[in-house]
């Protein structure tokens, strides 16, 4: 990461690329026990949240990520009631999950309370569901939370984490996935952000391999645009305990959903289930 008087620039060694945003200044900064969190104001992308030099979200395009990590999984499950979010400290995913009126309980566990406090201060539009009576916000280790989570108690687990480094490294291995597998009901789903399908397919393959070793039987990776992330293209990966899962979704419910979205709809969901040939070939679909 580099900054000067007018630009925030993030360099991506893994992809040999960089991305920049014209800024008007730094609005806030806090050093938590886990990471440094910075907020910048930009000329065209609203506010930026940066953690340890890596851009996490912008006001302008965060809806893409938050909608795609939430709604496909929730409309794929037949009747989700209980959801766990690991990570998700900016609370945008929590907001999207709680748009579903039949959800009864959501527990969000993020290791760093300061991410949520900074989001409440600078991205209040993401935090409109923080006081929903169905929501419980915990600030502790997500790996430990899943280790202690009761068996067969959760319908959907959403792993809304940073990249697999630092505090999030433990969310990308077999041990963590075994805890998720045990906590999910038989028809439960795990969905996790899975990086860029254009540049990091090997990481997605490794994630699926670790999930498979933990017991998951079927997988589907859904790509979507994300301009502020490396390559401008991102993905989430759904995992099922059922060997014959085809990830068909409740299309009528998605078409008649009683809430607004900016990116997700039933037609898009249907299309994203068909991967581009290079992804299908690499992932054996």
UniProtKB/Swiss-Prot annotation:
Q: Which domain of life is it from?
A: Bacteria
Pfam families documented for this protein: Spermine_synt_N (PF17284), Spermine_synth (PF01564)
Q: Which residues form the PABS domain?
A: 5-241
What is the catalytic activity of this protein? S-adenosyl 3-(methylsulfanyl)propylamine + putrescine = S-methyl-5'-thioadenosine + spermidine + H(+)
The molecule here is called Polyamine aminopropyltransferase
Its main localization is: cytoplasm
On assembly, the entry states: Homodimer or homotetramer.
GO MF, one annotated term: spermidine synthase activity
> What are its E.C. numbers?
2.5.1.16
Name the UniProt key words of this record, in alphabetical order: Cytoplasm, Polyamine biosynthesis, Spermidine biosynthesis, Transferase
Q: Which HAMAP family match?
A: Spermidine_synth
Which residues bind S-methyl-5'-thioadenosine per the record? 35, 110, 141-142, 167
Regarding protein family, the annotation reads: Belongs to the spermidine/spermine synthase family.
Keyword Cytoplasm carried by entry? yes
- Cited SUPFAM superfamilies: S-adenosyl-L-methionine-dependent methyltransferases
Species this chain originates from:
Xylella fastidiosa (strain 9a5c)
Question: Which residues participate directly in catalysis?
Answer: 160 (proton acceptor)
Q: Name one GO cellular component term.
A: cytosol
Places the protein is found: Cytoplasm
Tell me, in a sentence or two, what this protein's role is. Catalyzes the irreversible transfer of a propylamine group from the amino donor S-adenosylmethioninamine (decarboxy-AdoMet) to putrescine (1,4-diaminobutane) to yield spermidine.
